[in-house]
Amino acid sequence: MSKKIQAIRGMNDLLPKNSALWLSLEKTIFDLFITYGYQNIRTPIVEKTDTFCRAIGGDTDIVEKEMYSWKETSGESLSLRPEGTAGCVRMMIEHNLPRESIQKVFYQGAMFRHERPQKGRYRQFHQVGLEIFGVFNAKADAELMIIMHALWQTIGLKNIVLEINTLGSNEVRNAYRKILVAYFNQHKNQLNEDGLKQLKTNPFRILDSKNKAIHSLISDAPKLMDYLDKKSIQHFKQFKSYLDALNITYVINTSLVRGLDYYNRTVFEWTTTDLGTQSTICAGGRYDGLIEKMGGTPTPAVGLAIGLERLVLLLEAQNLISTKSTLSIYLIAFGKKEQIKSIQIANVLHDELPNVILYNDLTLGSFKSQFEKADKAKANFALILGEQELNNNQISIKPLRNQGTQQTMNLEEAIKYFKENQ
């Protein structure tokens, strides 16, 4: 017996019954971004591995353990993208876009990481991202928060907290890194295997550790805030003043460092307690040195990404999945002439009722079987074309969800009827 074919663990199918929610959510997000002046971009899901090594850092867990990478016959190493910013930056450099003007862009698509699959964490996951290139002012950082705040209000999200922090300039961060390493080296005996590795590769990640045994050690660690330069302090102060002006509530979390090496100054996360350990819904920050690091002209930048799977899980947890459905019609016809006429009627209805879902039965089955399919499709109305209707140049409308009694009328009247009942 052949082995049952199935998807790769941690890479999930989006089934037809769930796709309407995703399409509606994505449209809501994209429409909002566009109203704030952001333009859509698309980058390949495969990049040169070096692109991610240079952006994320070659000694990070993402690059060392989590990326899906392989070598071409030419010997060049390629990788599936584990996140979206590196590809956006590569695109900006390659096409000299920041030189033209300030770039405000958004992207969407699948990302890939070889992780242990669990609820809210998958090997293939989907993100929507916002990026601003060419603006150093904290007003750009604040605009991203304003957009997210507007999105949460639009979709009705509750119990979500904005956490913010500043990592200072790259120079301050590098100096603080040495101080942090010296501190944790004095307490190496309290660190587990992961902590010891992070001490060598990225000591900032220790500050974000979920290991409860070292929480007191972390709370006693030197604070980055005590080493900030004046420009970083002023930038963070401006950022907070914009949030205060719009009554956007936030919490300053000095342990918030973000998992990617390229961040500096402002970092932020929108978190919730409704999803257990996978609490981050949206996160990002400023990465002013990344374009230069990857070979481009020095360009300030700030961005964020939303995890769509987690956002959907949160909507479900908060019972915010809308039950409102688009008006749907199931066109039922019986007989060869009626089937041909039904195709013509369907064409007219699609033109006249562009926002209505129209199912035109393709099975050529009995009236009974077609009605059963209409019921299974959860259509609001059955549009019936039988011999009598065809001869009289009419069509019958049968409500399927207790909206009234069956009526017979001409097509023009039927179109008017549906427009009034949308």
From Swiss-Prot:
HAMAP family: His_tRNA_synth (MF_00127). Keywords: Aminoacyl-tRNA synthetase, ATP-binding, Cytoplasm, Ligase, Nucleotide-binding, Protein biosynthesis. It catalyses: tRNA(His) + L-histidine + ATP = L-histidyl-tRNA(His) + AMP + diphosphate + H(+). The keyword Chloroplast does not apply. It is found in: Cytoplasm. GO terms for cellular component: cytoplasm. The keyword Cytoplasm applies. NCBIfam families: hisS (TIGR00442). It holds the Pfam family tRNA-synt_His. One of its GO terms (molecular function) is histidine-tRNA ligase activity. The gene is hisS. Belongs to the class-II aminoacyl-tRNA synthetase family. One of its GO terms (biological process) is histidyl-tRNA aminoacylation. CDD domains: HisRS-like_core. The lineage of its organism: Bacteria, Pseudomonadati, Pseudomonadota, Gammaproteobacteria, Candidatus Pseudothioglobaceae. InterPro entries: aa-tRNA-synth_II, aa-tRNA-synth_II/BPL/LPL, Anticodon-bd, Anticodon-bd_dom_sf, His-tRNA-ligase, HisRS-like_core, HisRS/HisZ. Homodimer. It comes from Vesicomyosocius okutanii subsp. Calyptogena okutanii (strain HA). Its EC number is 6.1.1.21. This is Histidine--tRNA ligase.
